[in-house]
Amino acid sequence: MEHNILQVIALAEKLKYEMRHSWLSNGRQESVAEHTWRMSLMAILVEPYLDQKVSIEKLLKMVIIHDLVEAEAGDIPAFDTMNSHELQLQKQKNELEAILNIKQTLTGSLGEELYDLWMEFEAKKTYEAKVANALDKLEV
């Protein structure tokens, strides 16, 4: 395909078996894909109650791609990076390399859009990014 979309779809499949540091109510470990799905549902459900108007399309895109880098970089739990500055820097480096690879794979405006959304999520400056980050913390 023109933008190597199938490569990114194949990469995203890894999120189905990339396990997170959290467990479901039935005791089974959660995958990154399950985490992302539930965050997406939460975004739809809370959007009407937010203090400010958001672009639900942008919010959902941000939620969906925020952990795409973990398909390549793996999931390093936040509580591991809290006590290790070195591990925090390694996580940032790995994830930045991963999003740059995704951007390069997709090329053009689609690659730019995913890169920009991921960077916006990481910066936590816009209202959508703040909401997405809050949902990420709530969905553990």
Placement of each model-derived feature along the sequence:
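Alpha-helical, largely C-terminal catalytic domains
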Residues: 1-140
